[in-house]
Amino acid sequence: HVLVDAGISGKRIEAGLNEIGLKTAEMDGILVTHEHSDHIKSLGVLARKYGLPMYATQGTIDAIKEKSAIGKVDESLFRVIHPEEDFTIGDMRISPVPTSHDAAEPVAYMMYQGDKSMGIITDLGKYDNYIVDKLQGLDVLLLEANHDVHMLQAGTYPYQLKRRILGDRGHLSNDLSGQLLGKV
C-alpha cells in the first residue's frame, strides 16, 4: 500500500487509513507529486514517525529541502524517481508521468498491480496527447477538476493568483478536465 501525497494532517491521514482497515505503519511509502504545501503538509511527520520512504523526483526533493518544508528527516528515506522511468514497490509497478504545473519537477502517477490499474493526476495546468495516451485503459482515474473559469474570474482572489491558476502551469478548469476525460 502506498500514499500519494500527504497534504493534510498526519492525524487525518491516520484516521482515514484506519477507517478502511489500514495502518499508517503498514504503508510501503509515500509517492510525492510535487513540493507545494497542500501536498506535503504531513510528509515529514509521517516519514519520521513511521520511517516511510518518500518517492519523488530530484527536483521535488531539492525544492522540499531548500524550503525546509518538512523539517528534519532521515536522508535515507528519500527515494529519487525519474519521470518516464517505471519503478516498483512490492508487486506494484509505478510509472511517474511529467506534468505541467508551477513546481520544480511535478509528476502524476500511473500504478499497475496484477490486472488492475489506476492513475492519479492532480495540479495539472494543461494536457496534451502525451497525457491523453498515458491515461488510456486505466481501471480508475483520479483527476483534478479545479475551478469554474467564470466563478474564478468574478471571485475575490488577487489578479496574480487568478492568472497563476488559469495558466498552463496552474490548474485545469472543470471544463478542461471534462474535455480530458472525454478523450480517455
Residue ranges and their predicted role:
Residues 58-108, 112-115:
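Metallo-beta-lactamase
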Residues 129-184:
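Cap/insert and terminal regions of metallo-dependent hydrolase folds
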Residues 10-56:
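Active-site metal-binding motif and surrounding structural segment of the metallo-beta-lactamase
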Residues 8-10, 37, 125-126, 147:
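Short, glycine/acidic-enriched loop or turn micro-motifs at the edges of active sites
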Residues 22-25, 46-50, 72, 134-137, ...:
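Short, conserved loop/helix-junction motifs that constitute active-site signature segments
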Residues 103, 120-129:
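Active-site glycine-rich loop that binds ribose-phosphate moieties when present
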Residues 1-20, 107-123, 140:
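Conserved beta-strand hairpin/beta-sheet module of binuclear metal-dependent hydrolase folds
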Residues 4-7, 27-35, 54-58, 119-122, ...:
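Active-site neighborhood of phospho(di)ester-bond hydrolases with catalytic His/Asp-centered motifs
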